[in-house]
Amino acid sequence: NKFFDQQPIPNLKVKQSDVAALCHSMRETAKKNAASDFQRQEIKELTVNQLISWGVLLEHKGQLIPTYAYAMLTHQAGYPPVVQCAVFKTEDRAVFIDKREIDAPIQEQVEKAYQYVLEKINMGARFQGVYRQDIYELPPDSIRELIANALVHRNYLEPGSIQIALFSDRLEVTSPGGLMRGVTPEKMKEGFSKI
């Protein structure tokens, strides 16, 4: 079985400048997210062979063939579709306060959508002794997970955009496509999973 992102994408050419920029971007992202200086120093340059082994590129008769993963990571051929973000005044979509479309490579979409939500949600504070700790109204780790899962696990064969809607009482992340066959919201609430 092959995954959608490992399928070759028709009519897209691989440019060495795009491959170099992708390798650089992925390395910089890894360095930025490293937990320590030691980990940062251990991060090596990425190579075309690594992209091939990960299924980002395919090799056929000495030619590099782009996959949908390559298109999403380099933001080419309309992939990934834009992420639509909005803040609504109340508990419905009648009046929006702010909106933004994020049209970027998939790794930037995750980060920019996450930062957008953090900018728009309320922040409070908790005091421990003489120290103040800022606390978001929603857990940032959960927000990041929702957004990353929506982008990574969406059905890219379905048209449409991922929508991130912040209401006065909740955050909704909507992804095109439906649930897997045999999965219903009721079953999910009872712990059912196809994973």
Say what each PLM segment does.
Residues N1-I195:
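Active-site helix-to-loop segments that bind/position phosphate- or nucleotide-bearing substrates
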